[in-house]
């Protein structure tokens, strides 16, 4: 059964990676419309890009774990560490945004970091749901 979990995760990561590629493709197709549109569209595009980049990094990290650890027990141990780190990072980013005092100088970076973390967190939650 452990092998089937790893196999399921690998297949799910391939599907998620395809979703990331589609998301990036959609962003590229809409680039001209966004750049010529209102600032709110640029902001939305930037947050979407950060979110997708976070998803891609989480997928890449999980694929690396699958390649590095052949034993399911070792993989799950390191996966749980990764998932915990990403969850904690997401909580930290939300807290950081809520406590932002110097909005003009740090707002863009804080929002980008938050959406990057949210993208990673989405992947972890999705993988956790199929492992249950």
Q: Could you tell me what each predicted segment is?
A:
Residues 3-6, 10, 14-17, 42-45, ...:
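Amphipathic alpha-helical coiled-coil segments with heptad-repeat character
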């Amino acid at each position: 059964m452990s092998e089937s979990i790893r196999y399921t995760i690998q297949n799910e990561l391939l599907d998620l990676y395809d979703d990331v590629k589609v998301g990036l493709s959609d962003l590229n197709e809409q680039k001209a419309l966004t750049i010529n549109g209102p600032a709110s569209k640029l902001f939305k595009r930037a947050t979407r890009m950060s979110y997708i980049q976070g998803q891609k990094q989480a997928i890449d990290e999980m694929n690396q774990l699958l390649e590095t650890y052949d034993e399911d027990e070792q993989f799950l141990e390191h996966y749980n560490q990764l998932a915990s780190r990403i969850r904690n990072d997401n909580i930290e980013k939300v807290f950081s945004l809520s406590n932002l005092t110097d909005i003009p100088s740090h707002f863009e970076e804080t929002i980008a970091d938050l959406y990057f973390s949210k993208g990673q967190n989405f992947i972890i939650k999705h993988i956790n749901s199929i492992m249950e």
